[in-house]
């Protein structure tokens, strides 16, 4: 348990977390721009959650102290859990009994002060349909894989955070 608790003190662990999220974003962009898969709103929200995990790592990589770790754990946990819920909702849309009632928005619902889809359309513009299953790997669609990814991120977050709290360590 001490080993797990000590992971949050190392930049290597935070760097690996950042790198894992970067690989997922790189594959998403490859799927979009090289394979021609069009991301839907739910895909964009999941991509935003992955960017949230990447963003959470940056302060700790710059200066690993209690304040940056508190920020990182908070943003990481919110992003991982929110991403998992979005992936679950996306899966439900794709497998709805009546697809006419399972729809998603046309334009991303980003805050007016942060219109990512307008500022960075190559990353955050949604052009696909949430109900389409255009990609399958090992009998699982993209939302199913993202549920697995976010479950792993959430589980690691919980285990590391719990081990620090149980071991009476500062965040």
Swiss-Prot record:
The chain crosses the membrane at residues 14-30, 49-63, 71-88, 145-163. It comes from the Bacteria. It is found in: Cell inner membrane. Residues 31-48, 89-144 are periplasmic. Keywords: Cell inner membrane, Cell membrane, Chaperone, Disulfide bond, Electron transport, Membrane, Oxidoreductase, Redox-active center, Transmembrane, Transmembrane helix, Transport. One of its GO terms (cellular component) is plasma membrane. Belongs to the DsbB family. This is Disulfide bond formation protein B. It comes from Pseudoalteromonas atlantica (strain T6c / ATCC BAA-1087). The lineage of its organism: Bacteria, Pseudomonadati, Pseudomonadota, Gammaproteobacteria, Alteromonadales.
